Amino acid sequence: SFTIANGENISRGRGINRNHYDFLIKNGVDCVTLGNHYKDRIEVKDYIEQVDNLIRPLNIEEEFPGEGSKVFEIDGVNIRVSNILGSAYSKIPVKDPYLEALSVIENDDSDIHIIDFHADSTGEKKAFAYSLKNTVSAVIGTHTHVQTRDAQVLNTGVLYISDVGMCGSYNSVLGTEINSVIERIIKHNEKSHFEYLDNDDRLFSAVILKFNDLTFKGEEIIPLYIINKKGWVWEET
C-alpha cells in the first residue's frame, strides 16, 4: 500500500510545520502534498529539501525550494505523485496547469502517476483530468474540504474525484469552529479570527485507489467518509 495525505491545512488551517509533517510520516503517510497555503509556515522553506516525502505545488510562478513531482518506489513499483494548482479563481500566480503537467508526463516512465489537483473549480478539475487522456493514472481533486459524490473511472481510464474532502472537525464549517466563521463571513466582523476545535466529532475523508497488479491500470476508486470511526463506503455501481 501507499498513502498520500494533503497536509496544507494541518497546522491550524495554514500550511504545515515540521512537527505536523513528522506526525504524518510517523503515522504511516508515505507522501505529503500541499496547495495554495504551501508557504504559510515560513519554516517549510528551511526543511522541505531536508525531507524526502513532501511535495509543493509544481506550477507556482515564484522560485521556491522543493519539488512539485516525485517518484516513490514501493515493492518494486514506481509511483509518481504530482501536486498541481488550478488556475480558475486562483489568488496566487500560477503557471498553466495543463502545460506543466505535460512537461512531467513527457519524460515520465513511472508505473503509476497520481496527480493531486488542488483547485476551486470542479469544472476545471474534470476538464483537466479528461485533457490528460490516459497519460496519468489518477486525478484526485483537493481544496474545497467537501467530498464530492462523483468518484469514477473516466472513459479514458483515469481514476477521478472532484474533491476527496477533509479530515478534521465534523461539526464545523470546513473544519473551522462555526461561530468564528459566522462572525467573520456572515456578520463581516473583521476583528473575528477563525478558531479550531480540538474536541469534536472527527471526520475522516479519503479515497482508495485500486490498480491492476500486472498492467498498473486503474480499476476502482472507493471514497471513504467516516465520522468517529463510523461511516460508509461509496462503491461505484
Predicted feature locations:
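Acidic, metal/ion-coordinating pockets
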Residues: S1-T237
